[in-house]
């Protein structure tokens, strides 16, 4: 089964993403902080990381830098409530970027696309 890690400091977002992605057949773990995400990434193998950019404490971009150094090849989808980052995301070494929304169609589509791309 494909395993995803969702990292967001907002509990409601973590639960929503986990529920929706689980319904699509993925095994989903969640983390509410960079420290929790780092611990899970050391303990388990993941096929995809869904990562909020702006979090209290360690930011999503700081976590992304660690992932790029330590877990080369792990695909990452960045999420944020702000559309203003969209033009810059390609320089952040992420595979995709989505704007948070109550409609998770874009997130689900990007999860499928990124996973398919990395399985080739």
Per-segment meaning from a language model:
Residues 62, 82-100, 105-109:
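Alpha4 helix (beta4-alpha4-beta5 surface) of REC/receiver domains from two-component response regulators
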Residues 39, 61-72:
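Short amphipathic alpha-helix used as the core "switch/output" element in two-component signaling
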Residues 33, 59-62:
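Acidic catalytic/metal-coordinating carboxylates
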Residues 30-48:
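Acidic, metal-coordinating helix/loop segments flanking the phosphotransfer/catalytic sites
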Residues 14, 56:
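The feature encodes the CheY-like receiver
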Residues 52:
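Active-site residues of response regulator receiver
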Residues 15-23:
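Charged docking surfaces used in two-component/phosphorelay signaling
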């Amino acid at each position: 089964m494909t395993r995803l890690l969702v990292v967001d400091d907002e509990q409601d977002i973590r639960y929503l993403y986990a529920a929706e992605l689980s319904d699509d057949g993925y095994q989903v773990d969640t983390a509410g902080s960079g420290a929790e995400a780092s611990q899970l990434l050391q303990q388990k193998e993941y096929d995809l990381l869904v990562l909020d950019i702006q979090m209290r404490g360690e930011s999503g971009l700081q976590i992304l830098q660690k992932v790029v150094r330590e877990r080369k090849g792990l695909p990452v989808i960045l999420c944020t409530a702000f559309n203003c980052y969209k033009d810059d995301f390609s320089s952040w070494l992420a595979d995709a970027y989505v704007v948070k929304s109550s409609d998770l169609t874009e997130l689900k589509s990007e999860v499928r696309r990124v996973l398919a791309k990395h399985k080739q």
